[in-house]
């Protein structure tokens, strides 16, 4: 994964960084989303202080990330329980089928 330079414009600044080329579009989208959120927050807070809006947006993004991690963990636990139940059911079916004698024999 070769790193290639990318130039991003957001929050009134140009940021140059190196990232894998396949991530460039996602980084551009992230920069646009950040710009949008900060702009909306400035409007809601009725402030021109970009730094203050950035702090609130950063806190909101971290909170959203935390919620998504919790959802993922919960979903993983539910799936793990379902896998265990399915495995147990399959073991029971296999045990029953090996203990049963066939009703008839083909000769």
Swiss-Prot record:
Its main location: cytoplasm. It comes from the Bacteria. Keywords: Cell cycle, Cell division, Coiled coil, Cytoplasm, Septation. Residues 21-99 form a coiled coil. It is found in: Cytoplasm. One of its GO terms (cellular component) is cell septum. Gene3D superfamilies: Cell division protein ZapA protomer, N-terminal domain. Pfam families: ZapA. GO terms for biological process: division septum assembly; FtsZ-dependent cytokinesis; septin ring assembly. Belongs to the ZapA family. Type 1 subfamily. Activator of cell division through the inhibition of FtsZ GTPase activity, therefore promoting FtsZ assembly into bundles of protofilaments necessary for the formation of the division Z ring. It is recruited early at mid-cell but it is not essential for cell division. Homodimer. Interacts with FtsZ. This is Cell division protein ZapA.
């Amino acid at each position: 994964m070769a790193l290639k330079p990318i130039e991003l414009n957001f929050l009134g600044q140009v940021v140059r960084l190196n990232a894998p080329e396949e991530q460039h579009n996602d980084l551009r989208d992230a920069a646009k989303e950040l710009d949008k959120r900060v702009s909306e927050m400035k409007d809601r807070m009725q402030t021109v202080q970009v730094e203050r809006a950035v702090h609130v947006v950063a806190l909101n993004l971290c909170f959203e990330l935390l919620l998504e991690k919790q959802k993922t963990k919960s979903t993983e636990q539910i799936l793990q329980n379902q896998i265990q139940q399915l495995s147990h059911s399959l073991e029971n079916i296999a045990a029953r089928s090996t203990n049963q004698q066939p009703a008839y024999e083909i000769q």
